Amino acid sequence: MKRIAVLTSGGDAPGMNAAIRAVVRKAISEGMEVYGINRGYAGMVDGDIFPLGSKEVGDKISRGGTFLYSARYPEFAQLEGQLAGIEQLKKHGIEGVVVIGGDGSYHGAMRLTEHGFPAVGIPGTIDNDIAGTDYTIGFDTAVNTAVEAIDKLRDTSSSHGRTFVVEVMGRNAGDIALWAGIASGADQIIVPEEEFDIEKVASTIQYDFEHKGKNHHIIVLAEGVMSGEAFAQKLKEAGDKSDLRVTNLGHILRGGSPTARDRVIASWMGSHAVELLKEGKGGLAVGIHNEELVESPILGTAEEGALFSLTEEGQIIVNNPHKARLDFAALNRSLSQ
């Protein structure tokens, strides 16, 4: 394989630029040419494809977002869009593609593979909800950003004796809420993976104020449960009498310079994706499991609720993607007593 392309798709995540940089520089070191695709699958179909060299990725490792831009392009789910994209790739002499993004991006990569065009996926999303990897690019940065914000909210919460509901991104996964909640010493964490009793949440707030000597209360809420405003309304209906405020951290979690960890894992996975394409391997997604690189079938990782990893013998192992999350939920309960 002499010429490959790289794209970012779906929601942006800190560390994507580090992954692009690794793909470009690793490929060049292997004697391959690299092309960038602007705006994900939309740019692929439109032919927004151009050469990338070491100079173009210089000084990008510390930048958040993605300099290749990103876009959601539902038309690629249709056969017409897929064939149009492949036609553009062949027109530019491209033989394989590295796709950086979330599960929607992986579905696109899976379609390319089904049409016989080699594609390798790299998990890039702050949500950390991609099967086949313990961590996704951008997750660590998002958690650190959330912790910094919650620490500041605690300052004002304690100054005024208030309860704060802090809503964080994560789509249908509670990873950001759990990690940020534990790291910031949240009093309660509400995530989609665990059922909750709103009356118990309200009574816990009251008990903390009346019997534990606390003058403030922090609840970290994953957006996959409900909005912060809706949760606050339910709290009031359940009898909460505290001075309640809601803060939605929103898209701020997607921005900022990536952490050292995100830069390292992005570089590691980007380099390995090139190695796979050089070997002519497509239809795989790169991930990290137990601090080691792993490869998973894109077909498995793109299916919600499945978690696949490969042994050295090539056997597929199915694991439980929510075990660590539930362990963390139990951990926070024990620490917030």
Curated annotation (Swiss-Prot):
Pfam families: PFK (PF00365). Its cofactor is Mg(2+). Substrate binds at T125, I126, D127, R162, M169, G170, R171, E223, R245, H251, I252, L253, R254. Pathway: Carbohydrate degradation; glycolysis; D-glyceraldehyde 3-phosphate and glycerone phosphate from D-glucose: step 3/4. ATP binds at G11, R72, Y73, G102, D103, G104, S105. Keywords: Allosteric enzyme, ATP-binding, Cytoplasm, Glycolysis, Kinase, Magnesium, Metal-binding, Nucleotide-binding, Transferase. Mg(2+) binds at D103. One of its GO terms (molecular function) is metal ion binding. ADP binds at R21, A22, V23, V24, R25, R154, G185, A186, D187, K212, K214, N215, H216. The active site is at D127. It catalyses: beta-D-fructose 6-phosphate + ATP = beta-D-fructose 1,6-bisphosphate + ADP + H(+). PROSITE patterns: PHOSPHOFRUCTOKINASE. Catalyzes the phosphorylation of D-fructose 6-phosphate to fructose 1,6-bisphosphate by ATP, the first committing step of glycolysis. Homotetramer. This is ATP-dependent 6-phosphofructokinase. It comes from Streptococcus pyogenes serotype M3 (strain ATCC BAA-595 / MGAS315). The gene is pfkA.
